[in-house]
């Protein structure tokens, strides 16, 4: 059980946490250092955690149509804050490079929701994992502004970092006061339709990433910044999920990279470098980059633990000119009230998500691959050394 009170008075008041130090964060990536990071997901890994303590749990399905530059995501948010009743939300984002009038953002409260293993149901919405645990079908008509009927079929194995893909906060991993957990389907085909602005858009053998996440603590206490990449080409997919903790947890970086070819996971990397190229402070006060350069270093996914030390390194790089900003999301203006209440009024906390959709270049094994990337740069709280 999560015990926020163990995190000190800050968990109750929202004030800055004391400096606990690096020994108070136990990351999933550090547990696999010197071992094979890649572990394949099981059906149980895909089940909603549905824990009783305070948390925010999400299932996010990103989609990319390389030829048209259409990209976006559908997301279910399932949350419990303190002693309040559980709440659920469906959010949907669509960006279309050649037809900007189709751009859509919806956020809709869900009613009469429930979870059943990996499945989620609400009035006018269903998310179901098939019996073979190789495809999800998402159907939603909770709002006429984004009607969704799409199926995501796994093209590669699912990915988790280690047997337990959870990062724990606190001095006792058996009774942590905070957690962060991610599991991934890094390369999927997506088929179906979405209706926006009264127009039906067809997805046919396009590409997708699926991410299940659980955050079991206040977002501004868990991380001060995030970097995210969802890159697809016809032959490869690259995913990055990276966050940096606040000073209270020693500015610790937890970075997960996944490199795939058409049908396999080539490497899961935990030693990644993200360069924010030519950052410039914008009107809200954050140093926004003009480009991103992401370097991934790891070992082949087939290497067993006993051979990791002697294994030949594998590396890749993704470069993106951030020419197209889809949205600068003022999180405090967009998030549901139940989440806003836990971050409002915190000094130095001004969360913004910068969402981009751009062409990108993957460099791997001496070759270059052009593709399309949905990337996000998130700033949550002031940077301190």
From Swiss-Prot:
<feature type="region of interest" description="Peripherally associates with membranes">
    <location>
        <begin position="1"/>
        <end position="18"/>
    </location>
</feature>
<dbReference type="GO" id="GO:0005634">
    <property type="term" value="C:nucleus"/>
</dbReference>
<dbReference type="Pfam" id="PF08622">
    <property type="entry name" value="Svf1"/>
</dbReference>
<protein>
    <recommendedName>
        <fullName>Ceramide-binding protein SVF1</fullName>
    </recommendedName>
</protein>
<dbReference type="Pfam" id="PF17187">
    <property type="entry name" value="Svf1_C"/>
</dbReference>
<keyword id="KW-0963">Cytoplasm</keyword>
<dbReference type="InterPro" id="IPR051385">
    <property type="entry name" value="Ceramide-binding_SVF1"/>
</dbReference>
<comment type="similarity">
    <text>Belongs to the SVF1 family.</text>
</comment>
<dbReference type="GO" id="GO:0035621">
    <property type="term" value="P:ER to Golgi ceramide transport"/>
</dbReference>
<comment type="function">
    <text>Ceramide-binding protein that may transfer ceramides from the endoplasmic reticulum membrane to the cis-Golgi network membrane, and is thereby required for the biosynthesis of complex sphingolipids.</text>
</comment>
<keyword id="KW-0472">Membrane</keyword>
<dbReference type="InterPro" id="IPR013931">
    <property type="entry name" value="Svf1-like_N"/>
</dbReference>
<dbReference type="GO" id="GO:0005789">
    <property type="term" value="C:endoplasmic reticulum membrane"/>
</dbReference>
<dbReference type="GO" id="GO:0033106">
    <property type="term" value="C:cis-Golgi network membrane"/>
</dbReference>
<keyword id="KW-0333">Golgi apparatus</keyword>
<dbReference type="GO" id="GO:0097001">
    <property type="term" value="F:ceramide binding"/>
</dbReference>
<dbReference type="GO" id="GO:0005737">
    <property type="term" value="C:cytoplasm"/>
</dbReference>
<dbReference type="InterPro" id="IPR033394">
    <property type="entry name" value="Svf1-like_C"/>
</dbReference>
<keyword id="KW-0256">Endoplasmic reticulum</keyword>
<keyword id="KW-0445">Lipid transport</keyword>
<keyword id="KW-0813">Transport</keyword>
<keyword id="KW-0539">Nucleus</keyword>
<dbReference type="GO" id="GO:0006979">
    <property type="term" value="P:response to oxidative stress"/>
</dbReference>
């Amino acid at each position: 059980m999560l015990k926020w009170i163990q995190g000190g008075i800050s968990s109750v008041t929202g004030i800055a946490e004391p400096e606990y130090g690096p020994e108070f964060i136990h990351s999933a990536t550090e547990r696999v250092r010197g071992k094979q990071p890649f572990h394949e997901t099981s059906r149980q890994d895909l089940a909603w955690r549905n824990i009783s303590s305070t948390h925010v749990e999400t299932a996010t399905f990103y989609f990319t149509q390389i030829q048209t530059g259409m990209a976006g995501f559908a997301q279910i948010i399932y949350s419990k804050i303190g002693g309040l009743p559980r709440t659920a939300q469906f959010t949907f984002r669509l960006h279309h490079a050649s037809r900007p009038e189709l751009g859509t953002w919806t956020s809709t409260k869900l009613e009469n929701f429930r979870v059943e293993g990996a499945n989620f149901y609400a009035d006018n919405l269903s998310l179901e994992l098939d019996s073979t645990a190789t495809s999800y079908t998402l159907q939603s008509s909770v709002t006429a502004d984004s009607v969704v009927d799409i199926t995501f079929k796994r093209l590669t194995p699912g990915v988790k970092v280690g047997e337990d893909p959870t990062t724990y906060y606190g001095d006792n991993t058996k009774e942590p006061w905070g957690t962060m957990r991610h599991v991934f389907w890094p390369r999927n085909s997506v088929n179906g339709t979405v209706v926006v602005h009264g127009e039906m858009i067809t997805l046919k053998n396009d590409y997708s990433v699926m991410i299940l996440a659980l955050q079991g603590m206040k977002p501004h206490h868990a991380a001060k910044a995030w970097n995210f990449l969802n890159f697809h080409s016809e032959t490869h997919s690259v995913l990055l999920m990276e966050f940096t903790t606040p000073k209270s947890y020693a500015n610790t970086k937890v970075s997960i990279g996944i490199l795939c070819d058409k049908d396999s996971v080539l490497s899961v990397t935990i030693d990644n470098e993200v360069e924010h190229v030519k950052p410039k402070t914008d009107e809200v006060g954050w140093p926004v980059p003009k480009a991103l350069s992401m370097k991934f270093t790891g070992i082949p996914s087939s290497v067993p633990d006993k051979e990791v030390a002697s294994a030949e390194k594998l590396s890749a790089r993704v470069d993106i000119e951030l020419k197209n900003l889809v949205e600068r999301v003022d999180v405090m203006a967009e998030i549901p009230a139940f989440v806003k209440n836990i971050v409002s009024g915190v000094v130095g906390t001004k969360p913004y998500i910068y969402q981009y959709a751009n062409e990108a270049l993957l460099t791997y094994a001496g070759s270059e691959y052009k593709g399309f990337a949905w990337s996000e740069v998130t700033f949550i709280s002031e940077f301190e050394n």
